[in-house]
């Protein structure tokens, strides 16, 4: 029975594995041939060595390797050829270079022939056995024999590498060649290298186009090094660059019509040549940008150039000629480029404007018109773009950057707001982004303590940050807004009021009126934050104004002072009323009392009565919580007691109304305590005013005692409170409170209201101790 053979399955290699296999085979062959070449050279067998060198180069004739693998193989071969180069230069072979130069031209295949020719030719030049210009011209012409994109590209790169230190420059003799010969050589090599690099895109099928483009990008340095060689020539000065080098380079860049090549070559051109050269040829470079293919990212190219020249001009202002208007050149050319590219992405357009703005603020920091022009051009472009483009994160980020740059540079919001195109650009943003910019403006103003003295400037600022000040159509529902963030924002807006100041009282009051007009549009959720500091600043204003009048700094007759006081009163009163209208009763009540004290200090008595009545009205109608009522009345009593009202009729009327409100409190204990406290309204003893009405004092205390005595469970504490009020007047040694009244009160407390478990008992005991320590006559303990 015959034995069946097992079927064999052919292994299928992946593309990566196949590349690795091809590369390893070629590399091994190169190393084997290289080993034999070195042995031959060591044994002075030059012709054998050249044969092995030719075999090394034969491996570079392959079409099986990707550009990346081919580059790796080239580097291995390059090392062996350098060994050969060194041997030839040391002249151990005993032959003249002209002989060797002719010998290697008989190599069988064109690629090995040209590599060997370049190797020998570089030594030919170095040993000065032939003029460099003639050998270079011969080599550059010979290289035309290889038109395969990959092989030709690396051949010309080899030519560039081995001749880089042998190029004629400014110190070369005329016979050997001039710098112009080197320029012609490099530009010719650059042109041919670029053509080969561009042609590489056609080597792969259409489906592999993306892969091939990526492979091309990996080889871009082979082309760019030619421009680096040009920049390294000492003989290439600004004149030579602008008249000879640049026109030929940009001609090749434009004519190649390849977006990858154009993108890279423009970037490397800007990188390798000095900034002074770019300054002198700015128009040419920018006009070249306008002629590039539509797929080229001109924004990156121009932005790179702008940033470089802006930094150069900042460091070396004296090296920038007066006749070169950097900003004007960039601005006009950028405008033309944008117009010529209707499909240019908005984010790229905005990126160019960011660079332009940085340029003008670095080079011309005092020229605000340039900055305004940039913002204006940007805004005019944005309004014609679709909203979905404007709201892209990258676009939003750049618009905000455009708005932030002037704030960071000037550190003065007054300067920024003079840019007429600043505010219209903000309006192009969505609500949240407008709010962010507005907050940046507010923070900048606060952090730099920018004092704003002119009404027009205040109006401009508040219009610019209106997103923070009033409701807008595109804002989220208030329920969706974070309450803490909102409160923090409004507090910052409110703090701006303290930066509104002017030595001219008329201007300052006008500023407050403008601020009130803007803040008043904010609705109940905003004005609770913004109007309060405005009230306090207005009260401070009238105090300062009065002080200036009294000291003679401002000359004003009584009638005019009263008229001005009336205006400020109306302003303050209406501002507080706006808060009262949104049910901020406690706050409004306190503000009225604050205003009452201020107008009393300024001697505007009639206004004091009006403010007190307004406060009492809020107390009656809007303060419902009984604890809040007690606190409010205590505050009112303290405020009235501090007044210096010369008109007793007005004062007694206010005191009577206060007692009336106290008698209406919910709890009898509170009624009694507050009415007893009201007794101080009739015994005023302070530096600004002396007023004593003993009858009213006693009447208030008796009324308080009557109220608490009629309670079934009055509590000890209230009686002791009244007793302490009585002792206050005893200490004043006044007959307002008879000693007998106090003695009877003590007896009443001891015999009727003292209970062992009463929490107020220590309070009573301490009071009794005080009475004993004072030795009051007529009070028996």
Curated annotation (Swiss-Prot):
Domain of life (superkingdom): Eukaryota
UniProt xrefs under Pfam families: Vps35
Membrane topology: Peripheral membrane protein
Signal peptide: none
Entry's Gene Ontology cellular component terms: cytosol; endosome membrane; late endosome; pathogen-containing vacuole; retromer complex; retromer, cargo-selective complex
Primary subcellular site in the record, as a coarse category: membrane
Subcellular location(s) per record: Membrane; Endosome membrane
Record keywords: Endosome, Membrane, Protein transport, Transport
GO terms, biological process: intracellular protein transport; protein retention in Golgi apparatus; retrograde transport, endosome to Golgi
Family: Belongs to the VPS35 family.
Quaternary organization: Component of a retromer subcomplex consisting of vps29, vps26 and vps35.
Functional description taken from the UniProt entry: Plays a role in vesicular protein sorting. Component of the membrane-associated retromer complex which is essential in endosome-to-Golgi retrograde transport. The vps29-vps26-vps35 subcomplex may be involved in cargo selection.
Protein name per the record: Vacuolar protein sorting-associated protein 35
Lineage per the UniProt record: Eukaryota, Amoebozoa, Evosea, Eumycetozoa, Dictyostelia
